[in-house]
Amino acid sequence: MASTRFALDVPARCASAGTLAPDVPLCLVFGWVNARDAHVKKYTDVLTRELECCATVRATMPTARAFSPFERSRVAYVTEALTFARRAYGGQTPRKVYLFCFSNGGCWVQATLARARAEGTIARELMFDFEGVIFDSCPAFMSMKSGGDALTAVMRQPLALVVRLTFYALVLVLATVHLCTGTYDQMLTRKFWTTMLNMPNEKKELYIYSLSDTLTDPQKLEALIAHRAKNSANVKVLCFEQSPHCAHLRKHPDEYVKALREFIV
């Protein structure tokens, strides 16, 4: 079952059901910037076919929304995703719901939800209380370089250069505006990191990353994890020495699947 933006996959035991029963766990899976759906589906297949532990809603936030300076664009997208998930359960609430974020493209969903809880920008009846949140290669500290790297990771030249330079120019313009108006702390990248540092604790949080992944900046991520643990978050970590950005499943399948099996219970 799929829509233009969102896809629902279910374990074989639920395939004949018109709507899902509340006792079927749900995992919302959001891919990285410019992710191909087939690549994100490899992860939902692990959950629905290999582990058969939950139904999944799969999506990737459009790049323009992920990098938009306007929060309402992301709020609208997340609202659509939550509405789609609710409809799959006939308006009922699954007893267990998980969130699975890849890189900052997916992590923007968690950041948007965290702010929506505080600001009331998403209807409370749409929101879920997560049983756990999985962060794969995120949250990544955003610098001008890392943002350009993420945007152009799968692009070819000369398009990659054009996109990178355009992105740099937009960041400089926005930074100048914030500096001139005394609102630098409200700049998109700073708000994102502050939100991820100080968001309300989930029941449990799993961070999957590698020390060789420069896009994620493992030192910054480890500092964030330590900060959250110090503030009583139930933190679990799966760290690899060598593994590419958002490709830990491919590089370390056994350890990765084991971590998912133990986390989604």
Language model features with spans:
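Short, surface-exposed "cap/lid" segments of acyl-processing enzymes
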Residues: 2-66, 218
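Short glycine-enriched nucleophile-adjacent loop
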Residues: 109-119
